[in-house]
Amino acid sequence: MAGTRRKSLQNRQVGSLLIFLCISVGGATTIRYSVAEEMESGSFVANVAKDLGLEVGKLAARGARLVSEGNKMHFRLHRKTGDLFVKEKLDRESLCGKADPCVLHFEVVLVEPLQSFRAEVRVFDINDNAPVFLNKEPLLKIPESTPLGSRFPLQSAQDLDVGLNGLQNYTLSANGYFHLHTRFRSHGPKYAELVLNKPLDREKQPEVNLTITAVDGGSPPKSGTAHIHVVVLDVNDHVPQFSRLVYRAQVSENSPNGSLVATVTAVDLDEGTNKAITYSLAQNPEAILKTFQIDPQNGEVRLRGPLDFEAIETYDIDIQATDGGGLSAHSKVLVEVVDVNDNPPEVMVSSVSSPLPEDSPPQTVVALFTIRDRDIRVGGKVTCFLREDLPFVIKPTFGNSYSLVTDRSLDREEVSGYNITLVAMDTGPPSLSAETMIEVLISDVNDNPPIFREDSYILTVRENNSPAVFIGKVHAEDLDLGENAQITYSLLPPKNGDLSVFAYISINSDNGKLYALRTMDYEAIQDFQFVVKATDGGFLSLSSQVTVRVVVLDDNDNRPMILYPLQNGTLPCNDLVPRSAEAGYLVTKVVAVDGDSGQNSWLSYHLLKATDLGLFSVQRQNGEIHTLRQISERDPMMQKLIILVQDHGQPALSTTVSLNILLVDGFSEPYLQFQDPTRHSRKVNPSTKYLVISLVILSFLFLLSVIVIFIIHVYQKIKYREKFTIQEHFYDDCNFSNNLVQGQGNGSLSRPCPYEMCSATGTGNSEFRFLKRFMPNFPFPHATGEIKMEAGSSLPPNSDRNKSQRLEGHDQVSDDYM
């Protein structure tokens, strides 16, 4: 037996390597594969990328993943290669039980954009389970008078495999009394019956031991055995008789435990203990024994466990009635499970795209989900809808799969996220529903430019301000988030292109605060305007502009300026008034202006002082000076007035002007500027005399020093001339640099000669000392050597006399520069 199992395992491993892959596309959206069970973890199934017609690199780029309809995924996808592998060993019996075919459903989900493909893997059964008898040693009591051909049903063997690998046949060990007959159930495994071939004789053989073997159809086949112990009973003439050979019943799947299913009845014509009948479910599969029970006395069959129409629709129950003498009879109860709408629909979300950009176009896939209703036969059609009015709609994709897509434009600034409730409802009765909530966040895109709070700004700054003084702030808001809402401020020149505004103002790029760069002067500029640009930090930045006007406020920083009468800084202006002038005579008018503006430039005129305050008056508003009365002979000829001109600033600034008014008899006499006679009558101050004497003495000493220095200088010059001789030739034409001193003689020489000169600084005189000629004397072939003398005569060249005269001419040039 161990060798057989080892060989079977080897064959199974070989079969795992030679997997038959059946690939098809259902409705162009479903891919199907077939694999054998018991494949080891990591076994290759198929290449999904190839079957879907996708490039291998796109699986990883689009975040491909597998989503199972159940709670567990049995496969894994290699994103780089597109290969599909078994995640763990597959056991068809634990996955699907007796269901055939065994199909595992999952989806291949891709994102960016969201897309899904339905896939199915059919798990083929291998013969990895042997038939098993639950009761290894069943006991049968058969009366010796049992007629030939009597049948005795045996407990069926259980084989978890399906199809050919499941239970196929029974065999019985060789004996002289019984042979075996295999029977079929409409729903359930095959079972065997013992058929009596030879009459029993308790006196000859009170017991018979048999071995029954259950065999499946695998290759190689597997089997299981049970040992039957037959006890031959003494004669019991009558066996129990059921009222029906087959009982039929219908039970709703939602019936509670203990519900009555059916009542079987059997009678026995014997008397005494042989007439007492006991009912049992001895020869039934384990699933029936867990679900039903029978009262041994009255034959009532009741529910022991829950029913599930979606799992098992009908039950075939074998009922055994045994009398007191050991004789038994069998009957069947066929139970049909009635489906009720007891399962609400299930909503299974396989993928959600969140966050979702707010600029996503309509029909963008947001989520993928499937709906399953186990009561689809009675529940009717399942509908799916959204509980609220949201910018999303549900679209069917294939089968029971759906996608949630956008229905209209999204705006994160209005709604930053959605809690979407998916409702699935069947038609009942009664109608059942299920809800699943999907949270979808809306991500921001830069679709809102900065917006200034004001259409335009007017700011004020007072003149004479300190540099870098804060004068105001502009503020813009951006409805976006993150970097898309980070605003940077900058200055733009006004529309007229005047860039000088940048010399007056600066802006903090982070907060929009404006500062004055320099001190403002209202008299130079009264206002100016510029443009502030606000730019957000988005990848494709957006901006907006606003005009800012800065008004300079005037300060009273300018005193009134007198335009008339003109002031020469020493003497006041004189005006002539005839002595014949009457009261109200216009003498003159003081004209003044103020560089400020507004109230600071309003001027008023006041008579501050006067020789005779009762003789003249000043108009407060216009500065006109009039006589208050007629001039008399007693009035002094010189009238001195001091006029105060004052502005209206806070504090007020003022300027005074002095006027001399001469009272004359008429304007026909020539008039010289009148000097104040009191000056001649003033006495000379003794200190002034001493000052004048000191100045005279100092001047004399200075002149004497100059004469002495000049004599010494002439003497040194004569000594210096005796040490050098003059070269015979001079340059005809010479060009020298600008730092050389050129001297032109006053008639003694016809052309200048350059020399280096040195000035003795700090000596208090203007002495120049000629050290040497700047350039050597080279003879020129065309030099004439002719020098004009003071008397205008000329001598032949190269004569001694000419040489001496040239020397004198050279000294004359030096004297000219001295």
Curated annotation (Swiss-Prot):
Its primary localisation, in coarse terms, equals membrane
Its annotated compartments are:
Cell membrane
Q: Does the keyword Repeat apply?
A: yes
Ranges for region Disordered: 789-818
Q: Name one GO cellular component term.
A: plasma membrane
What highest taxon heads this organism's lineage?
Answer: Eukaryota
Which intervals carry biased composition (Basic and acidic residues)?
800-818
Which first-to-last residue range defines the signal peptide? Answer: 1-28
**Intervals, Cytoplasmic compartment:** 713-818
Q: Which residues lie on this side of the membrane: Extracellular?
A: 29-691
Segments passing through the bilayer: 692-712
The UniProt entry's GO biological process terms, in alphabetical order, are: cell adhesion; homophilic cell adhesion via plasma membrane adhesion molecules; nervous system development
Any idea which UniProt keywords this protein has?
A: Calcium, Cell adhesion, Cell membrane, Glycoprotein, Membrane, Repeat, Signal, Transmembrane, Transmembrane helix
- Could you tell me the membrane topology recorded for this protein? Single-pass type I membrane protein
Q: What residue stretches are annotated with the Cadherin domain?
A: 35-133, 138-242, 243-347, 348-452, 457-562, 577-672
Which CDD domains does the UniProt record give? Cadherin_repeat (cd11304)
According to its UniProt entry, the function of this protein is described as: Potential calcium-dependent cell-adhesion protein. May be involved in the establishment and maintenance of specific neuronal connections in the brain.
Protein name as it appears in the record: Protocadherin beta-1
Q: Give the organism the record lists.
A: Pan troglodytes
Q: Which gene encodes it?
A: PCDHB1
